[in-house]
Regions:
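N-terminal secretory signal peptides that target proteins for export/translocation
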Residues: 1-5
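Bacterial N-terminal signal peptides
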Residues: 8-20
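Boundary at the C-terminal end of the N-terminal hydrophobic targeting segment
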Residues: 23-30
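PEST-like low-complexity, intrinsically disordered acidic/proline/serine-rich tracts
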Residues: 30-152
Length: 152
């Protein structure tokens, strides 16, 4: 009987720990993206997905000097809520806008049919720069965002 009581007391705590590990893995930058593979893409915005849990910007990399795969890319940004708090809304990136995106390529490096990356910054032709929101646990910090805690 005592072992059943102990199990009843320990099981909920264990379930919470396991749930936290799964949630952390989902939101881990290092699970999907490679901090040793920085990218720079130059292209025109084709589509913006303003959805949870992450926004996505679709563009074609057309930079002739780029060492990255030319063609379609999906670039992950922060959550819509994170971006809204930074003053970015669904109308900040209009279809057809020319942008430069810096970020990090996916670990799988698969580009069929579309390459994937985690975006860090978007730069507009007039020089304005937008931070694309939190890159998640394990993402490199370059100090360009004042709200980021220092890397430990």
């Amino acid at each position: 009987m005592r072992s059943w009581i102990r199990l009843a007391l320990v099981a909920p705590g264990l379930a919470l720990l396991l749930t936290g590990a799964v949630a952390s893995a989902h939101h881990s930058f290092s699970a999907e993206f490679d901090s040793n593979q920085p990218i720079q893409l130059h292209g025109t915005v084709k589509r913006v997905e303003w959805i949870n849990p992450h926004t996505w910007i679709h563009l074609n990399n057309t930079d002739p000097d780029s060492t990255e795969e030319h063609g379609p890319w999906m670039v992950e940004g922060g959550t819509p809520n994170t971006l809204l708090r930074r003053g970015i809304n669904r109308n900040s990136l209009e279809i057809g806008t020319e942008i430069i995106v810096t970020g990090y390529q996916s670990k799988d490096r698969l580009c069929d049919p579309t390459c994937r990356a985690n975006g860090r910054d978007i730069t507009f032709p007039d020089g304005r720069k937008l931070f694309m929101g939190s890159s998640g646990t394990g993402a490199p910090r370059d100090g360009s965002d004042d709200s980021e805690p220092p890397q430990q």
